[in-house]
Amino acid sequence: NFPFRQQSDLFYLSGIDQEETILVLAPGHPNKSLREVAFVKETSEKIAIWEGQKLSKQEASEISGIEAIRWTNDFDNVLTELMSWATSVYLNANEYPKYFNPVPYKDLRFASELKAKYQLHKFERAAPLLMKLRQIKSDTEAELIRRAGEITGKAFDRVLSVIKPGMKEYEVQAEIEYIFALNRASGPAYQPIVASGINACALHYVDNNDECEDGELLLMDFGAEYANYAADITRTIPVNGKFTSRQKECYNAVLRVHDKAIQLLRPGITIDEFNKKVNTMMEEEMIGLGLFSKEQVEKQDPDKPLYMKYFMHGTAHPLGLDVHDVGSKYDPLEAGMVLTCEPGL
């Protein structure tokens, strides 16, 4: 078994956080009761004993604001009726650019079956429409993300108060997740990275099983999930509480870029443009740190810039119901969007 997490688009549209939920929207249908229908899993005495009570139709309606609530086992009959009326059908799928799974997941299997059965219908992508909606956060969404960030900040403060040489990375992770649970977060928004010493050179190190040694740095990349909304924070601290002079130089170089970069995150700029500007800032700081010279930069291969050896990832990504939330790096930023700012060295 795996922990259940609601599909983000479905949660965004309905607020229903229960497995086997389906949402169908047919706003132009002549029958008003079919224009907006949510299907939820019908409970039983056995399910109630083993899994707990599921939502009633009334509860699902109160949560979602949808009047027409049906049991999931009614879906096929309703779908047949809707398909006899519809011409175009919009289907949902995971369109995250880095997503790859050789085995088709449930939504893709459903799409294939539907296309095979209704070959004369026109099928469209729902993702671009939902992306436009989810990119701009409402006041409520912004507050939930802010709360996730506050809980994450409390976890960071906890680590600052307990970290010492000899502590294990997994003990640090335990402190983080303890604070998450204490503040009613549903857990980490993603697998926490607790990387001491050379482990921090692996961008997505998640073993978290080494000892934090005296004189080393500890990189932590973690975030709480609260009400399905994510935080994402990366910080680096000295294990013994004091930076060496070189560690301080590197830390301050990244901090300067971080502070300047935040000022660039304004409506009108794209994430792609933003990342390029930050790359230039990081390049200048690396020259100042003596990692390479201006002359070497002038002679570098443009396709393999020298800064990539030390800074090989983007600085910002959208944040929301997903840690890497919906949005295109080529679209201009708008007021109401929420993004991370994570330069590193």
Q: What annotation goes with each model-predicted range?
A:
Residues 1-345:
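Active-site neighborhoods and metal-handling regions in enzymes and metal-associated proteins
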